[in-house]
Amino acid sequence: MSPQTETKASVGFKAGVKDYKLTYYTPEYQTLDTDILAAFRVTPQPGVPPEEAGAAVAAESSTGTWTTVWTDGLTSLDRYKGRCYHIDPVPGEENQYICYVAYPLDLFEEGSVTNMFTSIVGNVFGFKALRALRLEDLRIPVAYIKTFQGPPHGIQVERDKLNKYGRPLLGCTIKPKLGLSAKNYGRAVYECLRGGLDFTKDDENVNSQPFMRWRDRFLFCAEAIYKAQAETGEIKGHYLNATAGTCEEMIKRAVFARELGVPIVMHDYITGGFTANTSLAHYCRDNGLLLHIHRAMHAVIDRQKNHGMHFRVLAKALRLSGGDHIHAGTVVGKLEGEREITLGFVDLLRDDFTEKDRSRGIYFTQSWVSTPGVLPVASGGIHVWHMPALTEIFGDDSVLQFGGGTLGHPWGNAPGAVANRVALEACVQARNEGRDLAREGNTIIREACKWSPELAAACEVWKEIKFEFQAMDTI
């Protein structure tokens, strides 16, 4: 045995299992600007100290394994290991802690959300020492952000492309989501766009099924877009869902959309995967297409308060991977979304810089430097009576998307679109005049009903509709 091999195998190495906290719990550690920081909500198994649980998370999501290995001596663990550097008990919860973990930047491949998540959340969530584990937030350092392209275009470029300023954009998901032929689908798209909407949308599970193949849908929707544009003088779009079973097929659909000259395509970024999403985002930037992102399957990951991953992390990941719009809840509709928490990750999507604010669920100050912003999309169980609240909550840089709230109008699709456009214009005008949308919202809508019979009919249909359930996503 050579002296070199003898040194590796014997010096400083003792086989066996040792406590994680001896190596990975480092409360004296001063975080670096280049570290990726994570806030985990940790629920240890009975008898497991929080320091050991936090250290276990740091170890298993970086360089650690269940036993001491002699190859530890072949590298610098201090350079590459994750560190649990701070632990806070969760107020009002028994045996639950927020454990803060710092990861050296060298652990992650440049420009890869896939690799970042594989490391940080890929394996540790099944760890037996933990009863539950939730990733609440990430601080992405500027040095890592600059390795990503981010959104294909961003908010300002989109407004310039569409020539639409000073108000939220209006959309509609075509219903029924499945079962329509391509021609009938295109008819519904035309009627909604002709009535005053900016966008219509494929539902997330509309891909290329036997009743409506993707190429037929793309052709009829393009015809609807051009006809509506010619008649209204406004730029229109339809989110053509390019999501497919393979990346190659997805790109083929995006290429066809570009050849048709439409402005925007769509992707289901969680079910489709981050690698596919980043590839599509790169194609969209190179070819002038906007990219709408649907978050189908997000609630499987983020709905439970104690286990999984908060949507603010998925939102940050999307801003890195690339998308110009993303669904973000409504606060007021049928889908989950507590107001302050929702506004917290809406700001993370749009703003260049967000301060740490635990009251809104923001655990870290985050700078996005020159990364373009993403438009949040409010959709799910909303209708004209919600328009004042949505306009006040989300502001101009948003997309307000009414599916049933457009197509469910008693007079048809086009009058439903008219009702939504009139309600939005009335709310924007009232806001610009200094009126309080939160206090006077219903009055503003009723006043607009006097000169819009379409809006009056919509208000009558949905006057009693409410979705009042306790939000599970709380601080």
From Swiss-Prot:
Function per UniProt: RuBisCO catalyzes two reactions: the carboxylation of D-ribulose 1,5-bisphosphate, the primary event in carbon dioxide fixation, as well as the oxidative fragmentation of the pentose substrate in the photorespiration process. Both reactions occur simultaneously and in competition at the same active site.
Naturally occurring in which organism (per UniProt): Stellaria media (Common chickweed)
GO cellular component: chloroplast
InterPro entries to which the protein is assigned, alphabetical: RuBisCO, RuBisCo_large_chain_AS, RuBisCO_lsu_C, RuBisCO_lsu_C_sf, RuBisCO_lsu_fd_N, RuBisCO_lsu_N_sf, RuBisCO_lsuI
Note: The basic functional RuBisCO is composed of a large chain homodimer in a 'head-to-tail' conformation. In form I RuBisCO this homodimer is arranged in a barrel-like tetramer with the small subunits forming a tetrameric 'cap' on each end of the 'barrel'.
Known catalytic reactions: 2 (2R)-3-phosphoglycerate + 2 H(+) = D-ribulose 1,5-bisphosphate + CO2 + H2O; D-ribulose 1,5-bisphosphate + O2 = 2-phosphoglycolate + (2R)-3-phosphoglycerate + 2 H(+)
Protein residues bound to substrate: N123, T173, K177, R295, H327, S379
Residues noted as binding Mg(2+) in the record, renumbered to the chain: K201, D203, E204
Name this protein carries in UniProt: Ribulose bisphosphate carboxylase large chain
